[in-house]
Structures are given as structure tokens and as C-alpha cells.
Amino acid sequence: MGAEQVDAIVVGAGLAGSATAWALARRGRSVAVLEAFGPGHRRGSSHGTARIFRRAYPDPLYVRLTGAAHRLWRRLADEAGEEFVLRTGGLDYGPARQAEKMYDILRAHGVAAELMPAAAAAERWPGVVFGDDPVLFHPDAGVIDPERAMAAMRRLAAAAGAEIFYETAVVRLSATPGGAVVDAVGRSWRAPVVIVAAGPWLEPLLGGLVRLPPLAVEQVAAFHFAPLTPAWNGAPPTPTFIRYSEIVLYGVPAGRDGEAPGAIKVGEHGHGRITTGDDRDGIVDSAARERATAFVRDGLRGLDPAPVGELTCLYTSTASDDFILDRQGPFVICSACSGHGAKFAPLTGEIAADLACGGAPPDHRFTLAAHGR
């Protein structure tokens, strides 16, 4: 049987791939989405019910992009008829967090924020031990529900004509004079453009076709901790938080995955075990568990320091932690979210759709050239 012809092929149906399919289908393109596993699988980087949405970055580029992403999250909610971002506010603190710099950048971009002494923050959020450094709070931060968001984006894409194929692992990508052919077991597709949003499988799929920069795939761990009292951190909602010290730790209300009412998901940003998409074992590192438990015991009053649940996730990172959003020939590279890409998902999909339709990358920093390729 010959290859099926479509306008665009999306490889990977995680957050970035689902968002890309939604964006392309809205533009009237015929789209085939190829996902190696089933819906809601936990093999990659997009699963679960809790990721942080935040505007606070020590980098003006990302602050601007979070604003654009926020507008697209709103559009998704309006089109799907449900909410995907719970607004909680967010705290940034710790000796390495650059709270003053981030406050100045947020205010310069018109983003509401407060910078306060640690003692004042402790009065408002008594469950957090802030130390001595200034604390940044911005009310627009919140919690993303990736599982519901991906399902909604795929549902909207399908309603606009996209076809989504689960359990369809790509075995070969081939460039052709008119675009590319994508082969799966027993079936092939042909399109002028292929968007590869495959996270840790990016290099195995594209390594022989596109000169990619070095990418690190890490298996990182996160843990769920139950509150000892419902109001452990003052009046609800509990804000997200990031503590920057020798090791970066974050916390976020865990949502449906929390395994206890009001559970908080706590994890390290990075410090994972190097692996690949196929080789990850899902085994939680005991040293990471000990560090998270110590942080909760010493830094989060009111949480039981014995975790009630734990999970692993994959980061695929560039050396700079900037994304790769670029096109080379018929291939759009939409990946390497470096552990901070969930909040940008609908914007990432919009940018990938722009690239697929002949547009330019939104910033030179996201190009292959900027990554040394």
C-alpha cells in the first residue's frame, strides 16, 4: 500500500505535539499525528496532573513568551469549555533566585508582582521556611493539568479533521524531493512537512537527517507529600514555589495524582540520571528521595515528610536550557523543552505550526544555529 498523503505529520502526541496538531488543524491543514504509545502514557515528559505555570524568569524573552502562552491557554479553555490552569500565585525564593532582578523584569513587562522581606512572606505563608533572602510573589502563577490539556487539544484537533494514531511507533523518517515520508509498522504517510515533537526520542528519529546539538535525557523524580492540616500554609490556594539554592526544588499542588487530599508535589529541577527514552527504568533514585524528604522536613512546616507517592519523568535538555524550535528542510524540530516547557505548550504548538507553514523562528536563540548547529 502506498503512503497516505497529508499536509503535515506530527510525530509525538505529548503536550507539544498535541498543541501543534490543534494549531495546524485550526488552520485547515490535514494532519496525521503519530504517537508511539497510548493516550495518557507515562513514558515521556508530559504525563500527570500538575506542572507549574509562571511568569517569573530572570530573562525578558521568557517573560514575554509566558504572556503569549497565557493568552493561548485562555483560548484553549474557551474552545474546550473547561479550565486547564488553576491560578494560585507563585513564590520564588532562596539565595540563588535573583528575586530582585525578576521583580524588576516582571514590572517592566507589566506583570503584577510583589517583592517582600522573608519575615513578611512567612506571615502570609507560614508553612514555608524562607530563610533570609527577599521573596518574590506573582499572582498569575498557577498549576497546569497536562493530562486534561492534551486530551482537549487532541479532541479539538480531531474535531477540525486531524487524525490521531496511537500505538504507532515511527521506524523511519526519509526526506524526499517534495517533503518527507514517515514509516510506521505496516503503514506510511507522506507530507510536505513533518513536525518532530518526540522529546527524548528526538535524536534517534532525526539524528541522521538533521545535525542536532548535544541533548541530555535525564530521568528525574518527584514526590507527593500530604498536609498534616488543611491550612498548613495559610489561606488557600497554596501557591506554587521554587527554592533556588545549591539544588533547585519546586513545589506545586499535586492535583488528581496526589494520592492524598491536598498533597503537594515536590521535586528537583534536574539532578536526574542520564538515560534514553527507551532505557529509562522508572526507578526513583534513593538520594533524590532523601533530599526531597529533608527539604520538606526542614523547609515546609505542616507537611508529613514521609512521601505518600513518587514518580519519574524525563527531561530532554539543551546545554543552554533554551528550546529548539526551527525548521531544516521538511523537518520542524519542536523539542528539548529542558524541564520548563509545559507552561509554553500551546505557544510551542503555534510556533511549530508557523514553521510548518513557512514562518520563521520566534527568536534566534531557538534556532539550530544558536545551538551550534
Regions found by a protein language model. Name each.
Residues 2-16, 32:
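Beta1/beta-strand and adjacent pyrophosphate-binding region of the FAD-binding site
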Residues 9-11, 34, 189-201, 349:
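Short hydrophobic core segments
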Residues 22-26, 83-85, 188, 200-329:
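Active-site substrate-recognition segment that forms the wall
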Residues 25-46:
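Glycine-rich FAD pyrophosphate-binding loop
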Residues 50-124, 132-133, 248:
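Dinucleotide-binding Rossmann-like beta1-alpha1 core, especially the glycine-rich loop
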Residues 95-166, 172-176:
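Flavin (FAD/FMN) cofactor-binding and adjacent substrate-gating region
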Residues 292-373:
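C-terminal catalytic lobe of FAD-dependent flavoproteins
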